[in-house]
Curated annotation (Swiss-Prot):
Protein name: Translation initiation factor IF-1, chloroplastic
Keyword GTP-binding in annotation: no
Pfam families noted in UniProt: eIF-1a (PF01176)
InterPro entries recorded: NA-bd_OB-fold (IPR012340), RNA-binding_domain_S1_IF1 (IPR006196), S1_domain (IPR003029), TIF_IF1 (IPR004368)
Family as reported in the entry's similarity comment: Belongs to the IF-1 family.
Subcellular location: Plastid, Chloroplast
Source species: Asarum canadense (Wild ginger)
Domain S1-like: 1-71
Entry GO CC: chloroplast; cytosol
GO molecular function: ribosome binding; rRNA binding; translation initiation factor activity
Entry-linked HAMAP family: IF_1 (MF_00075)
């Protein structure tokens, strides 16, 4: 059976080497996010200040996979 993952929205705070990013979730948690393969293949640029959807494992809540970059009109600010 596949592992259940939690999907959160957050803001990219800092860009780190090797496609890693520091992300502040909407619930104020600070986690380390990495870019999913689909985003990497599509050459989608993620920059500090972007809002993203991030998939977090139940077992390790300090790391997550960035699965979607929200456009300005998609964010609920």
């Amino acid at each position: 059976m596949k592992e259940q993952k939690l999907i959160h929205e957050g803001l990219i705070i800092e860009s780190l080497p090797n496609g890693m990013f520091r992300v502040r979730l909407d619930n104020e948690d600070l986690i380390l996010g990495y870019v999913s393969g689909r985003i990497r293949r599509s050459f989608i640029r993620i920059l500090p200040g972007d809002r993203v959807k991030i998939e977090v494992s139940r077992y390790d809540s300090t790391r997550g996979r960035i699965i979607y970059r929200l456009r300005n009109k998609d964010s609920n600010d």
